[in-house]
Structures are given as C-alpha cells and as structure tokens.
Design a protein with these regions (language model features):
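Helix C-cap/helix->beta junction micro-motif
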Residues: 72-73, 114
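A non-catalytic structural micro-motif
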Residues: 73-80, 149
Length: 155
C-alpha cells in the first residue's frame, strides 16, 4: 500500500499482497537487485492465520526468511515491524488473530537474538486508521508508518 497510496516510490519497495513466508524467494531476489542498505520487513498477518496460533512455527518461519535475506544481502540492515494488532471485529471472524501480542513478544526476542531492529508501531495506531474489516489500514496511516520506520532507522 505504500506505493498504491504514493507514500513511497515503486523503485524502492518490494511487496506482494497476501503473501506467505514460504513464497518470498522471488521478493528476496528482487530486493537483492536493488542492493538496499536498509530493509524493512512487515510480514505476519497472513502467516498468523496460516499457523493457527502456533507462535513457535511462525517465529521459525520468520527466522528462516531473515537468514535468506542475510545470505542474499549481508550488508543490509534489517528492521522487522511488529505484527499489527487487529480490532475486535476481526478477531470474532478469525480467532487466530487474538494473540498477536504473543507473536510480537517472541518476534521482538528473535530480533534481539539476531541483533536486528524491531519496530513496535503500537504508539502510532489509532482506531480511526482501520478499514472496516478491522485488519487493514486506510491511506492516511501509511505516511505515519513510513515516518516511524524512518525515525527508528535514523534516516
């Protein structure tokens, strides 16, 4: 959505809607061609539902992706965004989304262990930014999120 809402240039974003960890090899190769100094990752929502509450599997899969990225782009600095919380209406439809806090706790610990950046975006989230589905964000959220990532990475 960063490019869709003209927040970031398409030449600096590698993204695919609805993708799972197991499908990231093409995106990693695309990113490698860009030779980035900094990589921001924002994965998880689809894999939270796919792992059905298995936080350890989620962390293992995320860790494997980071290993691939580090191998492909060893000089890049990696920052992992926390999985965004969802509104209660979304949890009612998809109960696996109820324990996102557990995922983020282990995600932060994984980042610490790997000595990579972790971005807790909880301070920028407001109910008004959510779309009706209670999961996705409206266009006005993305500039705020981009600013937060830039701030954390000291860009």
């Amino acid at each position: 959505s960063f490019t869709e809402y003209d927040v970031l240039n398409t030449s600096s974003v590698v993204a695919k809607i609805g993708i799972h960890f197991s499908e990231l090899d093409d995106q990693i190769e695309q990113a490698k061609q860009l030779d980035p100094q900094i990589i921001f990752l924002a994965y998880g929502m689809n894999d939270v539902t796919k792992t059905n509450g298995d936080v350890d599997k989620f962390i293992k899969d995320y860790s494997d992706v980071i290993k691939k990225i580090q191998k492909a782009m060893p000089d890049a600095h990696i920052f992992v965004n926390a999985v965004f919380p969802v509104q209660e209406s979304a949890v009612e439809k998809e109960p696996a989304l109820a324990n996102i806090a557990d995922y983020n706790e282990k995600l932060e610990a994984m980042c610490e262990k790997k000595q990579i950046g972790y971005i807790d975006n909880s301070d920028i989230i407001e109910d008004e930014y959510y779309e009706e589905d209670g999961i996705h964000f409206k266009a006005n959220f993305y500039p705020i999120w981009a600013e937060k990532m830039a701030e954390v990475a000291t860009l």
